[in-house]
C-alpha cells in the first residue's frame, strides 16, 4: 500500500530507521481499502507502543491520494499458546469469556451528610449538592450547566468524598454513572489495547450520563491514555453528558499533560478545596465515627488528630482501624477506652505515620534540594534572591502545613516574628496572584514531602 509506505518513510526521518524497522515494518498488513488499513501486531507490547507513539501522528498525517484520512485498525496476533487455547476451546464448544472492565467501588460512607463543609469549601459542596438535587435552593444548578467541573486540592481536602457522594446520589436517581480513578482508566486503556477490545472500552465509557474521574494529574506522561481520554471527553461533552474531574493541582499547574486537555479542563468551572483545620478535624472524626456507629470519646479524637497529622485520609484510616480492632479485641472496653490502649491498638499505623510525617527539618531539606542550595543557606543570613526566596517558601510551608506559630518559625530560622509574617505574606500573595513558578514549586515540594 503506497500511502502506508510513504508514511513509514516519513517516520524513518523522524524516528530513525532502526526504530521503524523494529516497531512499524514488523506490523502485518491484513487488508486495506481506500479509507481503512487493518494491521496486526505480533504482541501486546508492539500494539501498546503503536498506541503511545504513532496513533496520534497517523490520525493527522496518514492520508490517501484523495487527501482523505485513512483509519488504522490494529489487532494483536494469537501467540502459539493462545492459539492452542483457542483451538481447545473450540473443540470443547466453549466460548471465550467476554471482555469486561472492572470499575472502582464507591465507599458506602462517602455520602453528603458525612462531608464536613468549611467556609473555603462551601461553594464546591453547594454546587455538587445542587447537581445531585439535594439542595433546598429553588433555582438549583442542573447537570451540564458547568461542564466540566474541576475540583483541586491537596490530599485529604475532600475531593474523593465529594465525587463519591455525588456518584451515590446520581446512581440512586437511576442515572448511568461511572466513578473511576485516573490510574484505573489508564489500566483499562492498556488492557483494552492488549485484548484488541477498544470498541468495548469506548462503549463502556461513552454510553453513560455522568463521568467522574479522580486524580487526573496521574495522566502525566501517559500519551495513549491522554489520547483516549481526549476523545472520551469530546464525545461526552458534545452529547451534553456531565464530566467531573478532581486533581491535586489546578489545570494550569498540571505537569506533562497535553495543552488541548488542559484547556478543556478549564471550559466549565474550576474550584479549589482546602484541607480541614485541626478544629474541623474533630468534627470530621465525630461524624465519621457516628457513621460507623461508634461513640468516639473526645480525648481519643484529640489523640488521633495529634498523632495522624499527614492528612485527613491517614486520620480516617486510623479511626476505622481503631473501630475494627476494638470490635475484634475483647480485652478493651469501648466505654473505658484510654489513650494508652488506643496507642497499643494502632501501633503499626502510628509507626507508619511517623515515617511519613512532615517536619520543619524535612521541609527545609526539600526546599533546599529543589533550589540546589544547602540547608545552611536557608537558615543563614544571606539576603540574595537565591537564598531569600527559598527561605520565604520554607517559612510559608512550615506555617501552612504544620500550623507553626510565627514565633516558633522565627526561632527555627533565627528571625523575629515580624520578618516571618512578612515572608509568609509575600508567598501567599504570589499564590493568590496565580504565580505559576511559586505554585508549581510548592506543588512539587509537597508531593515529595507526602511521598
Swiss-Prot record:
Keywords linked to the UniProt accession: ATP-binding, Cytoplasm, DNA replication, DNA-binding, Lipid-binding, Nucleotide-binding
Entry's Gene Ontology BP terms: DNA replication initiation; regulation of DNA replication
Function field: Plays an essential role in the initiation and regulation of chromosomal replication. ATP-DnaA binds to the origin of replication (oriC) to initiate formation of the DNA replication initiation complex once per cell cycle. Binds the DnaA box (a 9 base pair repeat at the origin) and separates the double-stranded (ds)DNA. Forms a right-handed helical filament on oriC DNA; dsDNA binds to the exterior of the filament while single-stranded (ss)DNA is stabiized in the filament's interior.
GO CC terms of this entry: cytoplasm; plasma membrane
Subunit structure: Oligomerizes as a right-handed, spiral filament on DNA at oriC.
Gene: dnaA2
InterPro entries for this protein: AAA+_ATPase (IPR003593), Chromosome_initiator_DnaA (IPR001957), Chromosome_initiator_DnaA-like (IPR020591), Chromosome_initiator_DnaA_CS (IPR018312), DnaA_C (IPR013159), DnaA_dom (IPR013317), DnaA_N_sf (IPR038454), P-loop_NTPase (IPR027417)
Region of interest (Domain II), ranges: 68-104
Pfam family, one: Bac_DnaA_C
MF (Gene Ontology): ATP binding; ATP hydrolysis activity; DNA replication origin binding; lipid binding
Subcellular location: Cytoplasm
Principal location listed in the UniProt entry: cytoplasm
Written domain comment of the UniProt record: Domain I is involved in oligomerization and binding regulators, domain II is flexibile and of varying length in different bacteria, domain III forms the AAA+ region, while domain IV binds dsDNA.
Entry-linked NCBIfam families: DnaA, PRK12422.1
Family as reported in the entry's similarity comment: Belongs to the DnaA family.
Stretches the record annotates as Domain III, AAA+ region: 105-326
Region (Domain I, interacts with DnaA modulators): 1-68
Span list, region Domain IV, binds dsDNA: 327-451
Residues that coordinate or bind ATP: 156, 158-160
Family annotation (HAMAP family): DnaA_bact
PANTHER family found in the cross-reference section: CHROMOSOMAL REPLICATION INITIATOR PROTEIN DNAA (PTHR30050:SF2)
Protein known as: Chromosomal replication initiator protein DnaA 2
Amino acid at each position: 500500500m503506497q500511502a502506508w509506505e510513504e508514511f513509514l518513510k516519513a517516520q524513518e526521518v523522524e524516528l530513525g530507521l532502526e526504530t521503524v524497522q523494529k516497531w512499524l515494518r514488523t506490523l502485518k498488513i491484513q487488508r486495506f481499502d481506500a479509507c481503512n488499513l487493518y494491521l496486526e501486531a505480533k504482541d501486546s507490547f508492539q500494539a501498546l507502543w503503536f498506541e503511545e507513539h504513532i496513533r496520534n501522528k497517523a490520525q493527522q498525517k496518514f492520508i490517501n491520494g484523495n487527501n482523505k484520512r485513512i483509519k488504522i485498525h490494529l489487532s494483536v496476533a494469537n501467540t502459539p499458546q493462545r492459539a492452542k487455547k483457542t483451538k481447545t476451546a473450540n473443540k470443547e464448544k466453549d466460548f471465550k469469556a467476554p471482555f469486561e472492565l472492572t470499575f472502582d467501588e464507591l465507599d458506602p460512607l462517602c455520602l453528603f451528610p458525612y462531608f464536613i463543609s468549611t467556609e473555603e469549601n462551601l461553594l464546591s459542596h453547594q454546587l455538587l449538592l445542587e447537581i445531585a438535587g439535594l439542595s433546598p435552593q429553588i433555582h438549583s444548578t442542573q447537570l451540564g450547566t458547568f461542564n466540566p467541573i474541576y475540583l483541586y486540592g491537596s490530599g485529604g481536602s475532600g475531593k474523593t468524598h465529594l465525587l463519591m457522594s455525588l456518584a451515590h446520589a446520581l446512581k440512586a436517581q437511576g442515572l448511568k454513572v461511572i466513578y473511576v480513578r485516573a490510574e484505573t482508566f489508564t489500566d483499562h486503556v492498556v488492557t483494552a489495547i492488549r485484548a484488541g477490545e477498544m470498541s468495548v472500552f469506548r462503549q463502556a465509557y461513552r454510553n453513560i450520563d455522568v463521568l467522574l474521574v479522580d486524580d487526573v494529574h496521574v495522566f502525566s506522561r501517559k500519551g495513549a491514555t491522554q489520547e483516549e481520554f481526549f476523545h472520551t471527553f469530546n464525545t461526552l461533552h458534545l452529547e451534553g453528558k456531565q464530566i467531573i474531574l478532581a486533581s491535586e493541582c489546578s489545570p494550569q499547574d498540571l505537569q506533562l499533560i497535553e495543552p488541548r486537555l488542559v484547556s478543556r479542563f478549564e471550559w466549565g468551572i474550576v474550584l479549589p478545596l482546602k484541607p480541614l483545620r485541626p478544629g474541623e478535624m474533630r468534627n470530621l472524626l465525630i461524624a465519621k465515627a457516628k457513621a460507623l456507629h461508634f461513640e468516639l470519646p473526645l480525648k481519643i479524637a484529640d489523640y488521633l488528630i495529634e498523632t495522624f497529622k499527614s492528612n485527613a485520609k491517614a486520620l480516617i484510616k486510623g479511626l476505622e482501624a481503631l473501630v475494627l480492632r476494638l470490635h475484634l479485641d475483647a480485652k478493651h472496653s469501648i466505654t473505658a477506652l484510654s489513650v494508652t490502649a488506643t496507642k497499643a491498638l494502632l501501633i503499626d499505623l502510628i509507626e507508619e505515620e511517623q515515617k511519613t510525617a512532615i517536619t520543619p527539618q524535612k521541609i527545609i531539606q526539600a526546599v533546599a534540594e529543589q533550589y540546589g542550595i544547602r540547608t545552611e543557606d536557608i537558615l543563614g543570613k544571606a539576603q540574595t534572591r537565591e537564598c531569600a526566596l527559598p527561605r520565604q517558601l520554607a517559612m510559608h510551608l512550615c506555617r501552612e502545613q504544620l500550623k507553626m506559630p510565627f514565633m516558633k518559625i522565627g526561632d527555627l530560622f533565627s528571625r523575629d516574628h515580624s520578618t516571618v509574617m512578612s515572608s509568609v505574606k509575600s508567598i501567599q500573595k504570589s499564590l493568590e496572584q496565580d504565580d505559576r513558578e511559586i505554585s508549581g514549586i510548592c506543588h512539587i515540594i509537597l508531593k515529595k514531602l507526602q511521598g
